[in-house]
Amino acid sequence: MVQMQTYLTVADNTGGKIAECIKVLGGSKKRSARVGDIIVIAVKQAIPNSPIKKGEVHKAVVVRTSKEIRRKNGTYVRFDDNACVILDANLNPRGKRVFGPVARELRDANFMKVVSLASEVI
């Protein structure tokens, strides 16, 4: 579960390192985001000389959450951190690589490009 003011790891090679959720998109009163939901982030830390700068605002998709995800077969999946992948205006990933595992729920949310860039899908 990611809500406003949650800090997330940026799991791609755009140059951002840490981001803060400033809005959860979808619905008028939606308070928390799960894996596959789109959020608006503010970049809090960035790598020097990268295209993403500190203070910039972007859309991102949540790829990992510390809060467990319940699946239809009764199993639960959780990760060590909250992570996101920065998106462009067409909701495609801005980076060319995705670091770490991502949840299989991204397939259901139609983020196939993120799934194909990921090294591991759990």
Curated annotation (Swiss-Prot):
Part of the 50S ribosomal subunit. Forms a cluster with proteins L3 and L19. In the 70S ribosome, L14 and L19 interact and together make contacts with the 16S rRNA in bridges B5 and B8. Belongs to the universal ribosomal protein uL14 family. The keyword RNA-binding applies. One of its GO terms (cellular component) is cytosolic large ribosomal subunit. Keywords: Ribonucleoprotein, Ribosomal protein, RNA-binding, rRNA-binding. NCBIfam families: rplN_bact. Binds to 23S rRNA. Forms part of two intersubunit bridges in the 70S ribosome. This is Large ribosomal subunit protein uL14. It holds the Pfam family Ribosomal_L14. It comes from Borrelia turicatae (strain 91E135). GO terms for biological process: translation. The gene is rplN. The lineage of its organism: Bacteria, Pseudomonadati, Spirochaetota, Spirochaetia, Spirochaetales. The keyword Ribosomal protein applies.
